[in-house]
Swiss-Prot record:
HAMAP family: RapZ_like
Family: Belongs to the RapZ-like family.
Species per Swiss-Prot/TrEMBL record: Pseudomonas syringae pv. tomato (strain ATCC BAA-871 / DC3000)
Binding site for GTP: D60, A61, R62, N63
Protein name per the record: Nucleotide-binding protein PSPTO_4456
GO MF term (any one): GTP binding
Binding site for ATP: G8, R9, S10, G11, S12, G13, K14, S15
Domain of life: Bacteria
Keyword field contains Nucleotide-binding: yes
Free-text function comment from the UniProt entry: Displays ATPase and GTPase activities.
Length: 285
């Protein structure tokens, strides 16, 4: 049986996450009281109609504070039943959450006459602290639109073929912000930039003209070898420490050329020695 617990601050994309999981065969329960988590898991296990139970539940700040405080004990109880249980935590920066609430005109679950929206958003982080501390996967949705979020959820949650650490190697452009949910970040802006070659500007690091140009640069090859040596040594240590998810981000200026090229190469070589290696290009349209 597989269970995914979805949590996060209001406006971060929890409803979208449940929609994606439901579309892919999960039985979803929104706003489950944390105290009922072990009972729900037990009932799903004994339900003979479910050959391979897939269960997703949303637990967030609408819970009683006392239930959230007991979340670590509830999670231990679920996992003691040999259930593969992942905790997904979604978040976005405060300005983005404020903007989303302003656009939808929805009421924040913690807002009151004496508590502003900004205060409610900040208080939510404190309430969800026990879940944040135990999250296996954190996704920051600040720079993601609806379709990008759906794709990210499918890649990280549904393309994980077996238990163990899932490694995501992600290219990005610094001009759109650094991915705050990355565990390791490599800055490759010091490398020769194909953008300044007019004949290469409209190509990406996935296309042969850019590949040929970058593969001929000694600095690029040296950077690749250094990053690969580091990851090849230390990623198995992450896996040995029972981490469920590790994100490695490779950044250049725009996220179209250098970071894409290196991310593709690293993904190809690391897939030969590690299981569950995924590649994503955040800023390629």
């Amino acid at each position: 049986m597989r269970m995914i617990i979805v949590s996060g601050r209001s406006g971060s994309g929890k409803s979208t996450a449940l929609d994606v999981l439901e579309d892919n065969g999960f039985y979803c329960v929104d706003n489950l009281p944390a105290g009922l988590l072990p009972e729900l898991a037990e009932r799903a296990l004994i339900n003979t109609e479910l050959a391979e139970p897939l269960l997703a539940v949303s637990i967030d700040a609408r819970n009683l504070p006392s239930h959230l405080t007991r979340f670590p004990q509830m999670l231990d109880e679920v996992r003691s039943r040999n259930i593969q249980c992942d905790v997904l935590y979604l978040d976005a920066d405060e300005a983005t959450l404020l903007k989303r609430f302003s656009e939808t005109r929805r009421r924040h679950p913690l807002s009151t006459a004496d508590r502003s929206l900004a205060e409610a958003i900040r208080d939510e982080t404190t309430l969800l602290g026990p879940i944040i501390d135990l999250a296996d996967l954190k996704i920051n949705t600040t720079h993601l639109n609806l379709y990008q979020l759906r794709d990210a959820l499918k890649l990280r949650l549904l393309n994980k073929p077996e238990p163990g650490t899932a490694f995501l190697i992600e290219s990005f452009g610094f001009k759109r912000g650094m991915p705050v949910d990355a565990d390791l970040v490599f800055d490759v802006r010091c490398l020769p930039n194909p953008y300044w070659k007019p004949e290469l500007r409209d190509h990406s690091g996935l296309e042969q003209p850019v590949i040929d140009y970058l593969s001929a640069q000694a600095d690029v090859e040296e950077m690749f070898q250094d990053i690969f040596s580091y990851l090849n040594k230390w990623l198995p240590r992450f896996a040995a420490s029972n981490r469920s998810y590790v994100t490695i981000a490779i950044g250049c200026t725009g996220g179209h050329h250098r970071s894409v090229y290196l991310t593709e190469r690293l993904g190809q070589v690391l897939q030969q020695s590690l299981k569950n290696v995924q590649v994503r290009h955040r800023d390629l349209s």
